[in-house]
UniProtKB/Swiss-Prot annotation:
The gene is ATPA. It is found in: Mitochondrion; Mitochondrion inner membrane. The record marks S373 as: Required for activity. The lineage of its organism: Eukaryota, Viridiplantae, Streptophyta, Embryophyta, Tracheophyta. Signal peptide: none annotated. NCBIfam families: atpA, PRK13343.1. This is ATP synthase subunit alpha, mitochondrial. GO terms for biological process: proton motive force-driven ATP synthesis.
Length: 508
């Protein structure tokens, strides 16, 4: 039987075939899971993969390639590995890990991959930034010269922090490390409300690493009650999250903070705490069979923290003059600051605030050891008035600590030593401060001026907090505001007259 096809039919058939011809083929490089366990998957067949590249498993779980070996690739899994089976397909994504960044992130709580976990829906307008980028070069930087005020008298007077600095907060558990960090965020509320331009506003990023979910929820509540969430981003990799997410969270938070730094704005990032990140990285490295070193940490644990903290910088005027200030937190064991991770981070940062359990239990809060705490670059950023006021403060406190140790052995002390002990006790009392009550810088200057110049010397110690509240509420607002501009001789006369009048009722 013969078939005859007319030319017109043939043309129509060919046209429809050509029209429906699909050319957009996608070629994926695929590997197979050889073994999986403890959050680590060994994959065979991904020969062209890059270090740090994201991959996707058949179950939809993502991972990152960390170990590139001859036979297979070591991949750490971002999530539960229970859905991954031997022989499953693994697909390259062709992209390095990135996270959302921008002002749309403000007020949100996200996980280490930038996915919102606060139940307020998806993120709106935002850009994406790589998690691992190089720190700014030498030419792009400028020396730190603007103050980053914490609202804490002990910090702003003795260990001042500048915008673009890295200041370590180190101490045992339950010594108030997180309290200092939270007070710093709360203090920016009044600073930002006074800001006249975007370049004066300071945005905050808080990275919670390995903390309890209840602790993070409590922090969100504190910040929202103080209306501080509107200029803050929270990145949470809690204790129940896999180690890879705890390892990644600081880098994700840093990428979000860098958006502000690179666009001529200012940001503060708090890593709470980097000890837990190092432990998570140690776990991953040992499971990837990398050789262990001191305290079983891998050899590149210094680089883990240095490449993160070097990204906090003050940019030059040519590159926008933005800044990223870092406050990393490290937890010590029984006050041992000579352990591996503490010494590493101390050597990377521009100074440290040391907190001690003994001071905390003696009621000196914040429990800052003034002798061990130091700020290597912050004094250049300190306000002129604060410099004038607290010039002798550190010396007097050092002399007080030295004499107080000897005073325990004998009571027959000369008048000069008695005066030194008396002044030191009052200075220590003045530097105490309740939690969640940061003070504006002009109020700090007033209180410290009163203590350093002997206006509290004749008062009982228990009356000093009351005296402090009294002078802060009754001083003329214009005199208080003028203190930020420096202490001229006229202002000093006016200030001393006011302090003498107020002090009379409190003297013994």
């Amino acid at each position: 039987m013969e078939f005859s096809v007319r030319a017109a039919e043939l043309t129509t058939l060919l046209e429809s075939r050509i029209t429906n011809f699909y050319t957009n083929f996608q070629v994926d490089e695929i590997g197979r899971v050889v073994s999986v366990g403890d959050g680590i998957a060994r994959v065979y067949g991904l020969n062209e993969i890059q270090a740090g590249e994201m991959v996707e498993f058949a179950s939809g779980v993502k991972g990152i390639a960390l170990n590139l070996e001859n036979e297979n690739v070591g991949i750490v899994v971002f999530g539960s590995d229970t859905a991954i089976k031997e022989g499953d397909l693994v697909k390259r994504t062709g992209s390095i890990v990135d996270v959302p960044a921008g002002k749309a992130m403000l007020g949100r709580v996200v996980d280490a991959l930038g996915v919102p976990i606060d139940g307020r829906g998806a993120l709106s307008d935002h850009e994406r930034r790589r998690v691992e980028v190089k720190a700014p070069g030498i030419i792009e930087r400028k020396s730190v010269h603007e103050p980053m005020q914490t609202g804490l008298k002990a910090v702003d007077s003795l260990v001042p922090i500048g915008r673009g600095q890295r200041e370590l907060i180190i101490g045992d558990r339950q010594t108030g490390k997180t309290a200092i960090a939270i007070d710093t965020i709360l203090n920016q509320k009044q600073m930002n409300s006074r800001a006249t331009s975007e370049s004066e506003t300071l945005y905050c990023v808080y990275v919670a690493i390995g903390q309890k979910r209840s602790t993070v929820a409590q922090l969100v509540q504190i910040l929202s009650e103080a209306n501080a969430l509107e200029y803050s981003i929270l990145v949470a990799a809690t204790a129940s999250d896999p180690a890879p997410l705890q390892f990644l969270a600081p880098y994700s938070g840093c990428a979000m903070g860098e958006y502000f730094r690179d666009n001529g704005m200012h940001a503060l990032i708090i890593y709470d705490d980097l000890s837990k990140q190092a432990v998570a990285y140690r776990q991953m490295s040992l499971l990837l069979r990398r050789p262990p070193g001191r305290e079983a940490f891998p050899g590149d644990v210094f680089y883990l923290h240095s490449r993160l903290l070097e990204r906090a910088a003050k940019r030059s005027d040519q590159t926008g003059a933005g800044s990223l200030t870092a406050l990393p937190v490290i937890e010590t064991q029984a006050g041992d600051v000579s352990a591996y991770i503490p010494t590493n981070v101390i050597s990377i940062t521009d100074g440290q605030i040391c907190l001690e359990t003994e001071l905390f239990y003696r009621g000196i809060r914040p429990a800052i050891n003034v002798g061990l705490s130091v700020s290597r670059v912050g004094s250049a950023a300190q306000l002129k008035a604060m410099k004038q006021v607290c010039g002798s403060l550190k010396l007097e406190l050092a002399q007080y600590r030295e004499v107080a140790a000897f005073a325990q052995f004998g009571s027959d002390l000369d008048a000069a030593t008695q005066a030194l002990l008396n002044r030191g006790a009052r200075l220590t009392e003045v530097l105490k401060q309740p939690q969640y009550a940061p003070l504006p810088i002009e109020k700090q200057i007033l209180v410290i001026y009163a203590a350093v110049n002997g206006f509290c010397d004749r008062m009982p110690l228990d009356k000093i907090p009351q005296y402090e509240r009294d002078i802060l509420t009754t001083i003329k607002p214009e005199l208080l505001q003028s203190l930020k501009g420096g202490l001229t001789s006229e202002r000093k006369i006016e200030l001393e007259k006011f302090l003498k009048e107020k002090g009379g009722t409190y003297y013994i």
